[in-house]
Structures are given as structure tokens and as C-alpha cells.
């Protein structure tokens, strides 16, 4: 077989080789630094055996995907250390994230002193340098394995997998975890790490579930890189809007009011009102008409839209379907309300496009572990809009929405600070989405072509679409490097049918419109946080 390397050079082998063997064949230094591999563009474990012609790239901690594998291994070392120090602790999940890693445990909260003790135990595990090995079990064997260990969260995760699925595990010495990988070859590869904080997080992000203890950490390929990151972290804390915003008397929070429910102080209100007036005036210039719709609705509305099936866990529900005649929910978005504004009258093809704008107060039941200052809250204000258009108008109107977003970013002086994302559906997760594959593929292609025509660099994110359509997400990083979505523009070819929306065409026949969901600067609270950290 012929292996093509990243630099274009080739290596020939008479028999199958593991990725780590190929790394050693290139150079011993590269093999020692290797964290994972790429085979034909797919990230794989170093233990993966290659048995046919392909392209192979060896990933180190200098590569984003290699660093993710290192951090994932660090999360396993963390979990082993916690269970050694706290034998009754139950393990949940422990992924790598953009800024490091975390692991969730069912156990007592950890103080800074406790985290320091866990760090010491992690260093012992790393020094021991246990070999990390991958193995598989059948679904039934995996469930039995974790039931015997009394690990209910792992059992639940496995039970959600399809029948007949082969389940992968990783062991480091005697400690074993359920995991898809990839991981380093040995715990000794985790050379530079730091546990940062501990907080609460509900299992699977739902307040109906057990509150777990989440431990955050970070890891790098060298101690110098870690030191530099920790120094940057200290500087970031000084610029954190959560600190500056309080010092500037822009907002505050109160425990008895609740997490994710900030009080905007008079100084903060002045800024948000200026933003609101500016956005509303700009939307009016661009042909938007204003609506004012209720803050709540019966569950029936969300059942029509599909939010009840696909988003209920993220909503605040008032009442019990089993005991109450009517159940209400605080609105997580404005779209279904504005559809009924449209349906209140009959519309001709000449009336379209119709552009509805509203400064909306919305409510979303966010995971407590994810909430921070003004960037992720449970009640927020947003410049929301929905455009009802004919299919032949869709591309032009979508481009105009992008232009409005870019204008707003330019005025705020932050257009250079954002990245564009084409958020697509995941064809492997059909329960998460409505509609047929051909509709998804067509609408995603329209957005891809538009972004290319507008010369906007973008990345494609599988599985990040709304349940009813793909979208453009315009994201920005906070002072800690975490990316938040600031502006969203969504292509919706499906909900008009759900709500039986139509217009009368030139032949007097009923036709389905298309819908664009969009924001101008997005959530005012998050925008305020962004501006505080920027300026």
C-alpha cells in the first residue's frame, strides 16, 4: 500500500501499519509528540490500523485536533484522580472543549483546595505513565460492565445507542472509561495541565435531572504554552465583562432573583436603549414593519411549530399536561407569533416580501453550568425579524439580511472580530430535524453559494442547524476565547407548511412562501457584554 504524507511525499508498505508505526517510520521525535492521526481527512486514534492506499497526517499538540486528543486524555486522568480520592463519585461525561476540557461527576462540590489535591493525584497518575489501550464490547456487555461498577450515567448513555452497536472503551491501568476517543498512547503524554474551576451542571443540560459537579481544566503540549495561557487568563479576567460591567454599574445579579436573570442598571439601560432605537430605525429604513406579540402562548402553538417536540427542554413550561386543561410556555422565540400576524390577512404575490421586526423579550431554560454574566442568560432582549417571501425572492432577501448584519457589525467597529459559520443538519440524526434530505441539501447549497458569491470566508458545522433549516451563524470570541453566536440568519423552507401559510399567485392559486429568520445585532445583553470587553 502507498501512504501519502502531508508534505506530499509517499511511503510504501507491504503490510498493514498502525498510525503510530507510520509516525515512528517518519521520525522518532514526531512519534513521541504524536497525539492523534488523520486518515483521508478523518481524525483517528494512533492505534488505528491502515491497510490501503490513503493520505495520513500525524497530529501533535501544535495542531488543533491533536491538542483536542491531548485534552481529552487529560479529562480521563482527571476522572481517574477524582475516583481515587472520592471512591463514591460517579462519572458522567468528560470531553475536550475549545479552551481545555471538563468532566462531570455526581459528588460533592470541589473547593480550590480540593482541586489542588486532585491536581496532585493527577500528577501521580501521569508520572506512573500507564499505557492507554482501546477495546470494544457489545452493547449488552457494556451495559452489564457499568451496571456492575454502579455507573448509572454511563449505562444511560449506552442505552441510548442503537441495538447492535459496538461500544469502544479506553483503559489506563486499572481505570476504564466509555469513550470514542481518540487518546494519547500513555498518560505520560499529559505534560502540562491546570484545573481551573468547579461549578454545577445538570446532567444533559436539563434541570429535571441530577445536578452534577463539573470540573474545568486546560492542557497544552508544553509547560511554556500552559504558562502563557494562564497569564493570558489572568489578563482576560481583568477585561471580563462580568467584572467590568459590575464596576461600571451597567448590570448586577442577585441570588434571590435567580441565575441567568441579570438586573440592568440605569447606565446599562442607556446603552441598550440606544442600540434598540438605532436598530429599529435602521430596520424601518429597510422596509420592516413592527409587531408586538405576547410573551407566552399555549402549548398548542409550539406543537404546530415543532418546538414542543424538538425544544421543550429549553422552554419554561407553565402547567402540567396531565392535570391542567391548558398548558402555557414562555416564548423562546418570536417566529410562530409573527406567522399568525401574517395569517391574519390574505396576501397577494405582490405583497411579498413582508418583513416583520420586533424587539422581543425571550426566555430560554439554559443549563446553569453554561450561564455567565450577560453572554448566556435565561431572559434576554433581541432584535428579531421574520421575512415572508416568495421562493424567487429568497436569495436576494437572504443576502440583504447578511448585508444588514454586516452594516451593524461595521457601525459597532467589530466586523473584523467575527467568523461566519454555515450551520448544517446532521443526516445521521434524523430525530433532531424535520423535512426531507433533498430540501436540506438544496437549502444548504443555496447558502453556501451565497457566502461564496459574497466572498465571505466561512466554516461548515454539521449538526448545528435549527431543527427546521440551515443557517448562517456569525460568531465572536469572548476574552477567554470561547465562541458565542452574535447574529443568526436562518433559511426556512418548512414551517410555512406547518402553519398553512400561503399567498395568492398571479394565477389566483395558493402558493407556499419561504421564511427567513434573522437578527440584526442579536441579543442586546450579549452585545453589551461584547462591547464592554472590546472597548
Predicted region positions:
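Ubiquitin-like/PB1-type beta-grasp interaction modules and other compact soluble beta-rich domains
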Residues: 1-75, 79-97, 117-124
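Glycine- and acidic
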Residues: 6, 256-268, 323-325, 339-347, ...
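Auxiliary tRNA-acceptor-end handling modules of aminoacyl-tRNA synthetases
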Residues: 51-69, 90-94, 102-361, 365-371, ...
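Active-site palm subdomain of RNA-directed nucleic acid polymerases
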Residues: 88-90, 405-419, 531-535
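Metal-assisted phosphate- and nucleotidyl-transfer catalytic regions
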Residues: 128-173, 410-489
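Structured ligand/cofactor/substrate-binding pocket environments in proteins
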Residues: 268-277, 347-360, 380-386, 393-402, ...
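A translation/RNA-centric and nucleic-acid-associated enzymatic feature enriched
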Residues: 326, 336-337, 341-345, 354, ...
Amino acid at each position: 500500500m502507498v501512504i501519502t504524507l502531508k508534505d506530499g511525499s509517499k511511503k510504501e508498505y507491504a503490510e498493514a501499519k498502525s498510525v503510530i508505526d507510520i509516525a515512528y517510520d517518519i521520525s522518532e521525535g514526531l512519534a513521541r509528540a504524536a497525539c492523534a492521526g488523520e486518515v483521508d481527512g478523518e481524525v483517528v486514534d494512533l492505534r488505528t490500523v491502515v491497510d490501503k492506499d490513503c493520505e495520513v497526517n500525524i497530529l501533535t499538540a501544535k495542531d488543533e485536533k491533536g491538542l483536542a486528543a491531548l485534552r481529552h486524555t487529560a479529562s480521563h486522568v482527571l476522572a481517574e484522580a477524582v475516583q481515587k480520592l472520592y471512591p463514591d463519585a460517579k462519572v458522567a461525561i468528560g470531553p475536550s472543549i475549545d479552551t481545555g476540557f471538563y468532566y462531570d461527576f455526581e459528588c460533592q462540590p470541589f473547593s480550590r483546595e480540593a482541586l489542588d489535591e486532585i491536581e496532585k493525584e493527577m500528577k501521580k497518575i501521569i508520572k506512573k505513565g500507564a499505557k492507554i489501550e482501546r477495546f470494544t464490547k457489545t452493547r449488552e456487555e457494556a451495559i452489564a460492565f457499568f451496571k456492575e461498577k454502579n455507573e448509572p450515567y454511563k449505562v444511560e448513555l449506552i442505552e441510548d445507542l442503537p441495538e447492535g452497536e459496538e461500544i469502544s472503551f479506553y483503559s489506563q491501568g486499572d481505570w476504564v472509561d466509555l469513550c470514542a476517543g481518540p487518546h494519547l498512547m500513555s498518560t505520560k503524554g499529559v505534560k502540562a495541565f491546570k484545573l481551573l474551576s468547579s461549578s454545577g451542571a445538570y446532567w444533559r443540560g436539563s434541570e429535571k435531572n441530577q445536578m452534577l459537579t463539573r470540573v474545568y481544566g486546560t492542557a497544552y503540549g508544553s509547560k511554556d504554552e500552559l504558562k502563557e495561557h494562564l497569564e493570558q487568563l489572568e489578563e482576560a479576567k481583568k477585561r471580563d465583562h462580568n467584572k467590568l460591567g459590575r464596576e461600571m454599574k451597567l448590570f448586577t445579579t442577585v441570588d434571590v432573583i435567580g441565575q441567568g436573570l441579570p438586573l440592568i442598571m440605569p447606565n446599562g439601560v442607556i446603552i441598550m436603549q440606544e442600540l434598540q432605537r438605532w436598530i429599529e430605525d435602521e430596520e424601518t429604513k429597510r422596509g420592516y414593519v413592527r409587531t408586538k406579540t405576547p410573551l407566552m402562548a399555549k402549548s398548542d402553538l409550539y406543537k404546530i411549530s415543532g418546538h414542543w417536540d424538538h425544544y421543550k427542554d429549553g422552554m419554561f413550561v407553565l402547567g402540567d399536561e396531565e392535570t391542567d386543561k391548558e398548558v402555557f410556555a414562555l416564548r423562546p422565540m418570536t417566529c410562530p407569533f409573527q406567522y399568525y400576524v401574517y395569517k391574519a390577512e390574505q396576501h397577494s404575490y405582490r405583497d411579498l416580501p413582508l418583513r416583520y421586526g420586533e424587539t422581543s423579550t425571550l426566555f430560554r431554560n439554559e443549563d446553569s453550568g453554561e450561564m455567565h454574566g450577560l453572554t448566556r442568560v435565561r431572559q434576554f432582549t433581541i432584535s428579531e425579524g421574520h421575512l415572508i417571501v416568495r421562493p424567487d425572492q429568497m436569495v436576494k432577501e437572504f443576502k440583504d439580511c447578511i448585508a444588514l448584519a454586516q452594516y451593524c457589525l461595521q457601525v459597532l467597529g467589530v466586523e473584523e472580530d467575527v467568523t461566519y459559520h454555515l450551520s448544517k443538519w446532521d443526516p445521521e440524526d434524523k430525530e433532531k430535524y424535520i423535512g426531507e434530505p433533498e430540501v436540506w441539501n438544496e437549502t444548504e447549497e443555496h447558502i453556501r453559494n451565497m457566502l461564496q458569491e459574497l466572498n465571505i470566508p466561512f466554516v461548515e458545522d454539521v449538526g448545528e442547524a435549527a431543527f427546521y433549516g440551515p443557517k448562517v451563524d456569525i460568531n465572536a470570541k469572548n476574552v477567554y476565547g470561547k465562541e458565542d453566536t452574535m447574529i443568526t440568519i436562518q433559511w426556512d423552507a418548512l414551517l410555512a407548511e406547518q402553519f398553512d401559510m400561503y399567498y395568492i399567485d398571479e394565477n389566483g392559486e395558493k402558493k407556499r412562501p419561504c421564511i427567513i429568520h434573522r437578527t440584526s445585532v442579536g441579543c442586546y445583553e450579549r452585545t453589551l457584554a461584547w462591547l464592554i470587553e472590546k472597548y
